Regions:
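N-terminal extension/subdomain marker
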Residues: 1-48
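Short alpha-helix boundary/capping and kink motifs at helix termini
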Residues: 2, 6, 46, 50, ...
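A short, basic-hydrophobic beta/loop patch
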Residues: 15-20, 24, 104-145
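Short, flexible coil/linker segments at or flanking structured domains
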Residues: 31, 40, 98-100, 125-127
């Protein structure tokens, strides 16, 4: 799937194994996993049931609230201000590449959906890059439970 403005991002299915840190160590996401009894094995086995769906800048996807999406620009600015230097630097490198090349192919951010709730599992920088350039990004929406 493609999102376009004057620049272009092509979204592809992400490699879930590259995102295990988000499950094992991200402190803000642990409560969601515990509340829904989500295991890493469930995520691994459910990833292929996911699909690319558009995600306009919003706190909801398909009417379902998305935890940790920080979808407003003000939320993004606050998040980035608190982020470590390496986090901001990686965003800047991605932004520079988009401006220089005019097009990027990126793994889609991952959203886990479970029991009427959703969680932005990974890919916030990629999501923000698209949103900040007026694009509608695509995410890999994974139904669990």
């Amino acid at each position: 799937m493609r999102s376009t403005s004057s620049l272009t991002i092509k979204w592809v299915k992400p490699d879930i194994t590259a995102e295990q840190w988000e499950f094992d160590r991200h402190p803000d996401k642990q409560e969601f996993y515990l509340r829904h009894n989500i295991t890493w094995e469930q995520i691994l086995s459910g990833i292929d049931a996911g699909r690319l769906v558009p995600y306009p800048r919003s706190e909801r996807i398909n009417g379902i609230p998305v935890a940790l999406s920080y979808s407003s620009y003000d939320d993004y600015a606050r998040y980035l201000a608190k982020a470590k230097r390496g986090y901001r630097r990686n965003y800047s490198l991605m932004e520079d590449a988009l401006q220089r090349q005019g097009a990027l192919t990126l793994p889609a951010p991952i959203i886990l959906q479970c029991n009427g709730e959703a969680l932005l599992f990974s890919g916030y920088r990629r999501l923000c890059l698209a949103w900040n350039y007026g694009m509608v990004p695509y995410v890999w929406l994974v139904p669990l439970g």
